[in-house]
């Protein structure tokens, strides 16, 4: 019994072992016959799908498969370049592996299916000995013109060449007939060609129409031209480079619809133009537009035109509302040049020209002046002021020392002076690193004359050196870093006369003020003439010493952009960006002024020698003094942006942004103005378009200002806009050959202004020291003490502007573009000092208030023609028109001859006259 039991147990043990062996054999057979060796998929168990997808990325195909099956795709960011390429898939009830084979055809990618996961990765490189091939060819565009620098790469290898100056190429060591050559070129659709039996190729690349759509820089971002519904005008950089002036502002006049520019001086270094967008709509402070260079508030005066890549003018509320407090007067956006993918491109440019006075007034000569003065004297006293003998001596020039005849304006100015500009532009890069560097020099000479006999140089001249370097680096497929460094060094020399920043202006004033017969420029004995009441203009220009000024600026921007959608697909289209900027400006001046000893002729002695007397005892040597100053600005910005096209019809774009600016002025005249100027705000934008036909956009800016009390520091400035691109409608298809573009748009919004003229922290009162209260009739009975200086106004708040804009854009025959806008602005609560407060109120200085109202309306339009006549001739015409008229609706205006300052009676009284002359300038505009 025990033996039988033992045998029975052994049989059971052997039976179980045999079952295990059978299971292993069956498993091996199953794996052998059901799993393909190449794609590693279980074909018989894979689902079947029907797909009909046009021009979508491989990632979008994967998303569609995920939605219709239980499979999930896994891949790394390193594969995104090929996965973002677009394909078209049309299959009907095919298995998943067949679909994936088609999707990944002509790529270096393979896949592996494990349970419900599909892992996409690089194919293992299989080395198969083949006879290497040499492929030659020629690459042209759609017009048959050779393309230079086209990138040609054998797919999956590092075998790369580019086309030569004639569009020809030769690529060696091509693996074999199954190799694929990739042709890529900026602005053209990439092309892949299987080598096959070809050894010589003729390749034509088609322009990338989608990629070439014009992009317009807007507030805190960019938009495609067709989707812009704000009043935005762009200016080509080439138009800025025509003007030889130092300042870009001088090139704005007549170039941009809606921009009015006035240049008041041509003196080197002091020739910057004042400019306004759509006229002047306020009699308060802060009427100039906000200027942003690479997104940072900066001046246009010392940017070289060669640095600029794009120039946009934002005019209506929709375009400027995101700037809130700073956008009331419009915004100018300047983008400097960025690197482009391709081999290094080096451009050297040199300009040389001459400057001359455009128009000088014609003055009467000395004799005519004396005759006219005699006529005037006859009316007043009945006597002549000058004898006929003196008039004849002046006319004949027999004794210019005693009878001078001087045209002072011509005496102190040259007929023409040279100026020049040289620039070096280097641009290029790869997909990982793009670079741009611009070096520029600008030099010009002023119009004032010099005296070769003087041992020092009094010429008016300027030299400026600019540099701008921009780097864009893709650290990963989803992370980009932008670094921008720029600045300038400027040396300027002016005559030592005057403490004004623009001495030439004062010298010109002297030339207008002095009569032609007061004295000659210099006496025949070398002495410099001048009477006790007037300054010799020629001596002011040539013998007053000199001032040497050195100015420098360093500008920097650092930005990091993270494409969140590439890290997590459900957030496709979402990007985060952080920006930091630090700018510094410094200047110093060495003042080597000299007061010249001057004389005045009294006659001649018996021997004919000139007799003179000293009118002013001057210096024996050049004086020495120095001045210095500067400022610095820090800016911080963080933003989230979203852009997504849904179902091929619905385009949604959004922006949420926070910014902060800190500015310190080292030139402050008092302690209160030396404190940092700080602003911060939030901005947002949401836009939607349907099929590229209908557009709607909302913006707002929420800004804080230090100028107001606690309850009024923050202001909310919203806007809304809508547009209709008629030519994208189906019923317009037959008219597109003539009417290539027709778009209507309109906007309404609110923007703000917080600038006060000469009054910081206006909600706070100030305490001054002085004579205190006075009594009596003589005006000198003051008792020393403290008194209230500026009266603080707690409820001071924002100056607000309500803006309305209606515009139309018309394109004809794809070469004529017309843009026209009607605008209306109403500016309320304008900051001003009250004028009608009686003296009995007891204010030492009139308080500030939100009081004024100004309406401004008009229209601007531009016409642009760009027509090509064959390959060798191109016609470009541009014109614009701007009309603006404003009306002062409310102004706290004093009565005729009414005092403007409620102060003690012995102080000077200012009179305000209600005249049309003021309103013709500020009321009716330009």
Question: Residues of each region from the PLM?
Answer:
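Conserved small-residue
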Residues: 347-398, 497-498, 868-926
